[in-house]
Amino acid sequence: MAQTTNEAKGFYKLNWMQRIGFGAGDMAQNLIYQTISMWLLFFYTNVFGLNPAVAAVMFLVVRIVDVIWDPIVGAFVDKHNPKLGKYRAYLILGGIPLTVFAILCFWNGFSGSLLYAYVTYVGMSMCYTLVNVPYGALNSSLTRDTNEITVLTSTRMFMANLGGLAVSMGIPACVKLFARGSELVGEQAMPADGHAWFMTMLVYSLIGLAFLFFCFSQTKERVVMDEKETANVKVSDLWTEFGRNRPLRVLAFFFITAFAMMSVSNAAGSYYMQYNMHSTTAQMSIFMGLGSIPAFIFMPLVPAIKKLVGKKNMFYIFLSVAMFGMIVLYLVSVIPALRSQMWIVYIAQFVKSAGVIVATGYMWALVPEVVAFGEYTTGRRIAGIVNALTGIFFKAGMALGGVVPGLVLSLVGFAADQSNQTPLAEQGILWLVCVIPALLLLLAMFIISKYELSDERMDEINKAIESKA
């Protein structure tokens, strides 16, 4: 069947298997990396034996390494054209070592060894960049069609949250399944069995690798730089592009704020349930699972919601919804009469997560827009560089999110071996789950108000680019 004129010019419509295949790449990364983000601090403090403050400093150091490493990867993938595909090749080339390092992060063979923790965590993070930066660039290489990108992003986030659900609900159950019964600290606690955590990460990482291979098999790059353009790509292009691409700067600062919020909130969720709400393992699984379930309801509706209220208003609405959920989570913990009402906690977590998922999920649809804007103004489509920049900023956000929980827990006197924490420690956990994330959401709302690329403007930009091709 012959291509339509629009398809010949890059405005491709993907079939559902291709959309699901692309989304499987994000689901795979969540099975691996979200497990790291959500549970590694808990593993380090409660199983591996690291002090929370020491772990916090390590998270910061690793993010500093990322600031150096990400632009190198971005320039490298833009400059080279592997036989397996310009961007998709790294799903395999980076996915295999990522899997190995992720598994080793949860091995307790060198319990308490800070050197081992650094080597495995730095290695995992560098390999994740080698997968994530090209994967992000792959999005903008599949099509220029803005409506298709919205559908593609919704599918991607649906799949990503399917992986997130498996992590948030499945990890507690899986760890308990593999636990040998001798490492439980109180009936409400997560098992502190190193073998159980290792086996759990082994299972999740291997499944994630399988989905990376599936993503590779279902994607085809259609909108990429030619050989002449790639020859001129260099690392310094990263900061040049950042300086002249205003929408990219706005999006970058939104990324750092959003990921800081998510990292703080995700890392503290297990502490909130275990020490503030004194939950059972089953209750913790439900709570963590509700962090992903709203995706299956709301992400398929994003194209219609965006069409109804507009891009910016959609951000405003769902960021506000998330803040409301955080307020309720705070009140449940501090009002004695509500502490036993776990159903209120579940509803609040669902509401908070619905807002966070839609707002932070749709932000990925803006990345191809800023790539196209850069191509429109300079004539160069450096998707890898742009995704390296967004990678730097979302990892900077994760750095803040990784440092803050450990430091706060240390400052308030958190004791991992105590099932009942002091009032100050409980208040510190509340700040991590509710107050700090809510303040970051307010900042994110202000930042996104400065984003200026409407759908109509993007249609004009993409048509202008194709007319020059």
What annotation goes with each model-predicted range?
Residues 2-469:
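Membrane-embedded alpha-helical bundles of multi-pass transporters/translocases
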